[in-house]
Amino acid sequence: MIEPLLCGIVLGLIPITLAGLFMAAYLQYRRGNQLGA
């Protein structure tokens, strides 16, 4: 049995984590692009 609270926390953290990773990769890509140009 998984507690609804725990399930809600996990479901809430997953999109935030994915968004954070995507933002970090995007910023790093932009920074590398500017340095290359």
From Swiss-Prot:
Per UniProt, the keywords (alphabetical) are: Electron transport, Membrane, Photosynthesis, Thylakoid, Transmembrane, Transmembrane helix, Transport
Whether Chaperone counts among this entry's keywords is: no
Gene Ontology CC: cytochrome b6f complex; plasma membrane-derived thylakoid membrane
Query: What is this entry's stated membrane topology?
Result: Single-pass membrane protein
Q: How does it assemble?
A: The 4 large subunits of the cytochrome b6-f complex are cytochrome b6, subunit IV (17 kDa polypeptide, PetD), cytochrome f and the Rieske protein, while the 4 small subunits are PetG, PetL, PetM and PetN. The complex functions as a dimer.
Protein localization: Cellular thylakoid membrane
Q: Which GO terms describe its molecular function?
A: electron transporter, transferring electrons within cytochrome b6/f complex of photosystem II activity
Any GO BP annotation? cytochrome complex assembly
Q: Which InterPro entries match?
A: Cyt_6/f_cplx_su5, Cyt_6/f_cplx_su5_sf
Q: Which spans are transmembrane here?
A: 5-25
- Stated family: Belongs to the PetG family.
Highest taxon of source: Bacteria
Q: Name one Pfam family in it.
A: PetG
Q: What's this chain's function?
A: Component of the cytochrome b6-f complex, which mediates electron transfer between photosystem II (PSII) and photosystem I (PSI), cyclic electron flow around PSI, and state transitions. PetG is required for either the stability or assembly of the cytochrome b6-f complex.
What protein name is recorded for this chain? Cytochrome b6-f complex subunit 5
